[in-house]
Amino acid sequence: MISFKKMHGNGNDFIVIENLTKEHSLSKSQLIKKKKKKKGLGFDQLITINPPKDSNHDFYVKFFNSDGSEADMCMNGVRSVGAYLWEGALAPKKPLLLGTKSKPVLIRPMNSKKVKVVLDYPVQKEIPKSEAKFLERCGLKKYKFINAGNQHLIIETKKVFSYDLDNLSSRVRRRKFFKNVNISLFTKLPKKLELRTNEAGAGETLSCGSASAATASFNIIDKSSIKIISAGGELSLRKINDKLEMIGPAEFIC
């Protein structure tokens, strides 16, 4: 019997499993079965909390998408992991360093069911000319390719709901270069950004933390902050030198 908690971070839907004794292992087919909303548990990502691989880290966290693939990072997910550990008394209520497939992230407990994540500043990447021409044929002109733990194609538009995002994402991911890339649309509003994301392996979600980080990274200056609004709620992001701080909710469903 696997013990778990159903949680969400800004509407991003998770199953969180404590696996500190390494007793649990789920196959890809089992993950897909648990994903099914009517017969399974339903989730955007399934998260396992494991013993640290590095002596400097407190825990090692794995993220599995609803199609059974493993994600490199999930910012909304690490906040939920923090809440799980602190509320379950599995760790003292203090900052924790979590190892991930991508890179370690620092989490800090906040008030009002919120958690702060401190991460390395997202990095903009170059897109090969052939892929840039392909995006142009898709009608895309204003975009950035960003590594924020996961790879993100961030597209600026006047209205985030003006595109068929599922169709666009499917078309773009047929290219080998973009196969595992998260695809987002954003628009600039007064003092905030509106964001919509289709995650590789999970589809469109109510919120994506790493997409929010990627989008904020080229829209703020040092020691300033910005709010990211998605269908699931609001995240607050701030640039501090070479780090990006994210504050958002982490709540238990059942």
Segments (PLM) and residue ranges:
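Short, charged beta-turn/beta-strand-edge "cap" motif at the junction between a beta-strand
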Residues: 104, 121-122
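C-terminal domain-closing interface element
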Residues: 124-140, 144-149, 244-254
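Short, solvent-exposed secondary-structure boundary/capping segments
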Residues: 113-120
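Short, basic/low-complexity N-terminal boundary segments at the transition from targeting/disordered tails
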Residues: 122-128, 163-168
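A glycine-rich beta-to-alpha transition motif near the start of alpha/beta enzyme domains, typified by
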Residues: 1-111, 146, 153-254
